[in-house]
Amino acid sequence: MKRILIIMAVLMMLCPDIYALTKKAEDSPAVQVLTSNKNARKLEGGMLKLARPALKKTPMAVVMDDIDMMVMYSISQKADEEEKQFAQQAINVLESYNKVSEIDDPDYRMSIYIDNPVGENFSEIILYTSRPDPSIMVFIGDFTIASLKKVGEISDQKRMERRRAKR
């Protein structure tokens, strides 16, 4: 009985620390991947967080809300030469801001471009997997419209070309 009481006392003493650690983890940068089968997958560097409902129809969505976060990408092995060059232009702009890291994971074979910057501190990144299955990464970061404008213009042209090709 004495041993049980000692163990309980030690656990009670540790509880505040455990709570503090949990709270700290909750405050860390949030990263979540929602796959087509609705399974959440944790990426390195953050706690899981629910993506916004507007992305329900997409096979995958990644949300990151840390101001100093990295954009993760991988250019598809299946992408044609034009798509690879296009993705590389977007990556070059992001790399100039030290905001990009490559994902070394076969599940993330996709090209990347920036679409629809909508505010000073918000932009959407569209990740295209092998057609016809697009995936969307949304991030909130400290990019400005000016830093994304060039790639945004390229993405607008590309989107129009894709629409014309579908007709």
Q: What is each PLM-predicted segment?
A:
Residues 23-84:
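Early exported N-terminus immediately downstream of N-terminal targeting peptides
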Residues 15-22:
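Sec/Tat signal peptide C-region and signal peptidase I cleavage site
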Residues 65-70, 105-109, 122:
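Extracytoplasmic
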Residues 4-13:
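Sec-dependent N-terminal signal peptides
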Residues 88-117, 163-166:
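Short Gly/Thr-rich strand-loop-strand
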Residues 113-148:
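A short, solvent-exposed beta-edge/loop patch
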Residues 27, 141-167:
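C-terminal partner/receptor-binding element of secreted or periplasmic proteins
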